[in-house]
Amino acid sequence: LGSDSDKYNESYYAEQYSEYLKTKHNTTLLNSNNAIDVLEKSVLSTGEPLGDLSILPTWELSKLASKTVTVALSGDGGDELFFGYERFQSIANNHWLKKLPYSMKYLLWGLDRLTLNNSYINDCALYKSPGEAHFGLNSRFSDGMLNNIIPSLANITLPEEYNNYNYNPPNDINELFHRIRKAEYYGMMQKTLAKVDRASMAHGLEIRVPFLKKTMIEKVLGLGINIHQPQKFRKKILYQLLEKKMPGIQPQKKKKGFSVPLTMWIRTGLKDSFYQRLLDDQFCHTYDINKPALENILDNHINKQIDAKWPIFTLYSLAIWSKDGRVDV
C-alpha cells in the first residue's frame, strides 16, 4: 500500500522484498481523491475519536489483506524494542545538558539555532525534564494551541493515573533510554495496538504481533542497551539481521512511518470536507471550541504558513465520531 507522495510511499521497497521472497504481490495507491471515503470509514471503525492519521492506511491495508487471508502479521513493537523512533535520539541527545540551569540551556539552544539550525541542541533541551520532553513530542497539540482552541481545557489537569511520562531523572544515558522505551511501551504503543486491532477486525482480519511475544521481549531486554547503540543507530540489530538474511536488498534506513501525505491532502482534495466538519456550528458548540481560532489555524495550514495536520486531524476525527459514531447512553 502506497500513496501519491514520494515522502511517504514505500511500495517500491515492498515490491523488492516480494520479488526476493517470491511472493504474490499487489500494490494499491491512496490519493486525495480516493482517501475521503477511506478516511471517514476508518475513523468510524475505531469506535472512538483517534488522533492517529495512520488509521487510514491501516484500515485500507486490512481491507485488501482480508480479501485473501484471515490472519496477518504486524511489525508493531519493533520500533519500541529496537529504538526505531527518532524521538529516542531527540531526547537523549540533550542529556549532556541536564545539570545546566535553564538560562544556559536556552542560550546554547538559541546559538545553535541561529548558527547550525539546531543540529546539536533541539527543542527537547528547553523542557524541565526528559519526561516532559517525551510528553511534548507525543502530543498532538501544544498547550498554547489547545488552550486557544478550547479555552475551557486550560484549567483541567490530567488524572493521577496518567503518569506514563512522569519518570524520574535518569542517572545515565542507558537509564534514560530504558525509561523512554518503557514509556513508549505503556503509552503510544497501546494506542497503536488499539488502532490496528479495530481497523483489522472491521474486516474480519486477525493480526498477530511477533515482536510482542513474551519470550521475544525478555530476550531483547536481556541484551541490555549498549548493544543497540541507540544514540547512533535505529533498529541496529534488525538491520544487521536483514542484511544477513537478504544480502541482495539495500535496506531502507530512513524511517518514513506508515502514514499518508495528509498535510498536502488537507490543502487539496480533502479541504472542503475538513472545513465543513471542523467549522460546523453544532460541533464547535458541543465541545466549546473557539471557532474563529480553529478557522485561523485551518486557514494557516491551507495557506502553507504552518503544518497543523496533527491537531487538525485529531479534531476532524472527533467531529466524525461526534456526528456519525457517537452513542449516548
Regions of interest found by a model, annotated:
Residues 1-162, 199-246, 306, 311, ...:
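ATP-dependent adenylate-handling active sites, centered on carboxylate activation for C-N bond formation
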Residues 31-38, 163-165, 190-193, 285-296:
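Active-site-adjacent bridging/hinge elements
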Residues 51, 171-184, 231-233, 298-315, ...:
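Structural motif
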